[in-house]
Amino acid sequence: MHNNFIFERAILIFAVILLTVTSCADAKKNYIIAVSQCSEDSWRQKLKQELEMATFFNEGVELRFASANDDSHIQKRQIDSLLSSGADLLIVSPNQTDLLSDEIDKAYEAGIPVILFDRKTDSRKYTAFMGADNCQIGNMLGLFIADKLQGKGKIVEIIGLRGSSPAAERHEGFVSAISRFPGLEIVRCEYGDWTEESGETAMKQILSGYDGAVDAVFGGNDRMALGARRVMMQAGRDISNTLFVGVDALPEPDGGMGLVADSTLSASAIYPTHGDELMILALDILRGKEYPKETLLQ
């Protein structure tokens, strides 16, 4: 009886040791996480820094980055290259919804987990999505403008990159909010590509065919709003009572928060990066843990 007890305890101890060793091995397993960024702006630099910081708390994680500089064809090639380099998981922010679907589908069908971050594609072939509610952001800024203008005024909108999901969703939410106020009118819309220069180009195009009042400018992001503001000043427009609003609100002197603080912009909606949460999601997927299919960042 005594020998049986000792034998059973020995088996139990061995099982505990085996589980511990296995658990440690899983925790220390090396992973290659590929990150395909559609651009290299300040917002994406912040995300990159947060992901890199997260690797200090997660041993055995190697990050491989590629930036497409707003070119969907370059991003296609970069995704192929990242996958062929032996990536265990792909994080991708598609430049445009339709042009990147095939490459992302290819990765998913090959058994490589795919996290869509910030942007979606036309396909449902992805492992998880993480990003903010862009429609809500556009709606919120529309209501802000409506409140400040007391429901009356002429509005110009500079939309983000044509074919990108944040641009389409922010526009949709903004128009939905403005349409609730009969006294508000969106007099002109032009597309940009998220850069300050494209905001300038869009506003020049608008002013070349419109010389009426502009009470508010909604930029799809802060940089386009800033570019539009500069052109209005250069054109000799009185902007002392014009609202300029954007999206991103980066906590930097020349970011959205700084621009609102010095009254260059009237408002900027925070567009969260949360690279730490993105890393947790990626590792949960790789380690076979439960994870949400859709995560909306606040």
Positions of PLM-derived features:
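Signal peptide-proximal N-terminal region
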Residues: 49-65, 179-182
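Flexible loop/hinge segments that line or gate small-molecule binding clefts
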Residues: 97-136, 144-147, 154, 160, ...
